[in-house]
Amino acid sequence: MNKVFGTKGSHWRKLDNAAKIFPATSNKKDTRVFRFYCELKEPVDGSILQSALDKTIDKYPVFLSVMRKGFFWYYLEKSDLKPKVKEEVDPPCLNLYIRDRKTLLFQVVYYKNRINFEVFHALTDGTGAIQFLKELVKNYLILRYRDAALPDISFTEEDMTLQDQESDGFSKYYSKTEGRQGKKASSFQISGPRTGYGSLNITEGLVSCQALLKKAKEYGVLSLIHISEPTRHS
């Protein structure tokens, strides 16, 4: 069994079951990269964000790994690469995993008030990405406001080990029991001109909170469900 990253003599780790599909199916059209971000009330200081990232990586050493391909499977290999914070200039969610190249599988970029964290899905899932981003933002705020003596809050269980961080939740919780098969509604088909090959757009909008809550109440759902449901069925 391979040793855990961050421990003496550890150099590689296998992908968990849920991650195995991503290296083989990623391409320029579907990069298998996703993004979480945090928007602050003031412009981001890039140098402070770099220091915060350096501190965050110490807690999550597995994020310094690169993807390698063996004879029969892909695996993550420990690397000495160091992540560099950049100001955002490219479209979101471009390729992070490039075959036969030794590159990190995540990046931290900033734009005005926003801290963006992008990651290749084989490296972590949404839960792990949120934990990383929360730790990053916490470290940034502590460094940015040293005089405020902000508390160093822990977002993970106090007794969580590196083995816990790298555990395969798919193997632990997956069940072969088939659920009830109901009739599925047809998905909504988005019309209009398509985005160029291999690129994404970010669409932002403002809406009245009162109007949103009123409309959600008419449907008997939470406001978040009212916003996300059309996207989920598209």
Predicted regions and their residues:
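Non-catalytic N-terminal regions of enzymes
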Residues: 1-165, 213-215, 232
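Alpha-helical scaffolds flanking conserved acidic
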Residues: 115, 221-225
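Flexible, P/S/T/G-rich "lid" or insertion loops adjacent to the active sites of thioester-utilizing
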Residues: 169-221
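Single conserved hydrophobic/aromatic residue that forms the stacking wall/gate
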Residues: 226-234
